[in-house]
């Protein structure tokens, strides 16, 4: 049987996070889009930051986490899970990167699992009171259709009045010609403008291609509508990033 998650030799993001954890260096993050656009940043430390280093909207949103059981989707190095554990939550943290999960466990996340997002159907129904998708991880839904399907799965594994706290980035807030051209191409293909296909590179490791979904607030509201969830409000800051508070109905 095929193991879940990304094979080690293609786990570029996992190797990046593990290298930072072991060496306390600052390895660069390289993201390649399928049109050839490449972005470069040295923000790996961000995946390890405690709550004092989070954005204002993240800090405001996480204070609203409710209940006792929480699910951290795309947990990375465990910054969200560790914070919620400190507050007394029973946290399940999931990621599709073996080395990311190894890092999260090494940092003290008690229940970190190698579980791709699309396999959340394996989790017990009526379990979680809060679901967190920080780090622009609304993007892990990948596409409009996949988002609606997975939101319904999230509904099944959450309890009454559960709260989904999800961060995204409005792709329309850009003047970058390459991004605007990409969005027009998406429109011609019947995709949302912010549905991008990317892969991660780190040293000799090249990750698999995957779809990542960036949406405006209006686009998010339309996606969520009719899935058993409803956007309660948005927490915004200067710039394109925002956090949505989405309630189970």
Predicted regions and their residues:
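SAM-dependent methyltransferase
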Residues: 17-19, 159-221, 225
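A short SAM/SAH-binding and catalytic strip from SAM-dependent methyltransferases
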Residues: 128-148
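Conserved alpha-helix/loop element of class I SAM-dependent methyltransferases that forms part
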Residues: 51-68
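A short glycine-rich, Lys/Arg-flanked "PGG" loop and its adjoining helix->strand segment in the class I
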Residues: 147-160
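Conserved class I S-adenosyl-L-methionine
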Residues: 68-76
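Conserved SAM/SAH-binding beta-strand->alpha-helix loop
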Residues: 97-98
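Conserved SAM-binding strand-loop segment of SAM-dependent methyltransferases
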Residues: 108-119
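N-terminal auxiliary segments of SAM/dcSAM-dependent transferases
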Residues: 1-31
């Amino acid at each position: 049987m095929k193991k879940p998650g990304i094979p080690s030799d293609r786990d570029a993001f996992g190797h990046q996070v593990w290298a930072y954890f072991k060496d306390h260096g600052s390895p660069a993050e390289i993201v390649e889009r399928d049109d050839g656009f490449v972005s470069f940043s040295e923000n790996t430390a961000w995946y390890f930051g405690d709550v004092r280093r989070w954005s204002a909207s993240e800090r405001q949103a996480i204070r609203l986490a409710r209940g006792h059981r929480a699910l951290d989707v795309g947990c990375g190095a465990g910054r969200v899970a560790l914070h919620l554990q400190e507050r007394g939550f029973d946290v399940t943290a999931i990621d599709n990167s073996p080395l990311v999960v190894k890092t999260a466990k090494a940092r003290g996340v008690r229940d970190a699992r190698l579980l791709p997002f699309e396999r959340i159907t394996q989790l017990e129904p009526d379990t979680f009171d809060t679901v967190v998708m920080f780090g622009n991880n609304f993007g892990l839904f990948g596409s409009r259709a996949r988002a609606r399907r997975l939101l319904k799965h999230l509904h099944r594994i959450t309890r009454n009045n559960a709260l989904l706290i999800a961060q995204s980035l409005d792709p329309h807030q850009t003047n970058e010609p390459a991004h605007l051209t990409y969005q027009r191409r998406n429109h011609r293909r019947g995709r949302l403008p912010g549905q991008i296909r990317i892969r991660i590179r780190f040293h000799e490791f090249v990750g698999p291609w995957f779809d990542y979904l960036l949406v405006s607030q209006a686009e998010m509201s339309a996606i969520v509508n009719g899935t058993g969830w409803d956007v309660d409000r948005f927490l915004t800051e200067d710039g394109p990033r925002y956090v949505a508070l989405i309630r189970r109905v």
